[in-house]
A protein has these predicted regions:
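Membrane-interface helix-loop junctions at the exits of transmembrane helices
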Residues: 46, 55-68, 131-142
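Alpha-helical membrane-protein architecture signal
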Residues: 33, 46, 81-88, 127
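Transmembrane helix irregularities
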Residues: 92-96, 134-135
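Transmembrane alpha-helices of multi-pass inner-membrane enzymes
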Residues: 1, 7, 118-172
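Structural signature of transmembrane alpha-helix termini at the membrane-water interface
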Residues: 15-19, 105-115, 131-138, 154
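Interfacial juxtamembrane loops and adjacent helix segments
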Residues: 50-93
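Hydrophobic transmembrane alpha-helices and their immediate junctions
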Residues: 95-121
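A membrane-periplasm/extracellular boundary helix in multi-pass inner-membrane enzymes
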Residues: 1-42, 50, 59, 166-181
Length: 181
């Protein structure tokens, strides 16, 4: 319990220090997340479409500031971002909460299968992607899509018997790569 408490204190200090290091950037992201979450609440089932995320965000931000319940800091850091800086919110905004939950279930399920079968490298890749996606926008780049699909597929295929040749699994990866590209 002492180690857990010490770890929590160190983590809290580290997060606070990182926040102070780039305060305006952090405040801007918090505003973006706040406004994006409000936009998701307006259309949670189907989202607004991938191409209209920036427009939906702009409309939600306009409504937020029109209500007048904002701080001076929020007014100072407001802008017109192309991305929400949080892929979970971005996916929910684009395609709705059900698609987000389905994607999380698929990635989480493949992580569990991979972990159970000793695919720790792939599980680490999925975990790092998940952490990175919390404060950035990796799904905007095809290389990250491909990496995510390959890690999910690698974990999922870890349950296949070893009698299936490696070339067949490689062929599936190549097909997935072609579909993404």
């Amino acid at each position: 319990i002492v180690m857990a408490g010490l770890g929590f204190i160190l983590l809290t200090v580290a997060i606070y220090g990182a926040y102070q290091l780039k305060k305006d950037s952090a405040d801007g992201r918090i505003l973006v997340w706040k406004v994006a979450a409000r936009a998701v609440c307006e259309n949670p089932w189907t989202g607004y479409g991938w191409d209209y995320v920036a427009g939906a965000y702009g409309d939600a931000q306009e409504t937020y500031f029109a209500e007048g319940d904002y701080t001076e800091t929020e007014e100072r850091v407001a802008g017109s971002p192309e991305y929400v800086f949080n892929e979970y919110l971005q996916v929910a905004l684009a395609w709705g909460v059900p698609v987000l939950l389905l994607a999380l279930l698929m990635v989480g399920g493949s992580w569990c299968v991979g972990h159970r079968n000793g695919c720790y490298g792939l599980c680490g890749a999925l975990l790092s992607f998940g952490v990175f996606a919390f404060s950035s926008y990796p799904l905007q780049f095809p290389l990250f899509w491909l990496s995510l699909i390959m890690a999910v597929a690698g974990c999922a295929f870890s349950v296949l018997p070893s009698q299936i040749g490696g070339w067949k699994i490689f062929a599936v990866f190549v097909l997935l790569a072609v579909m993404v590209a």
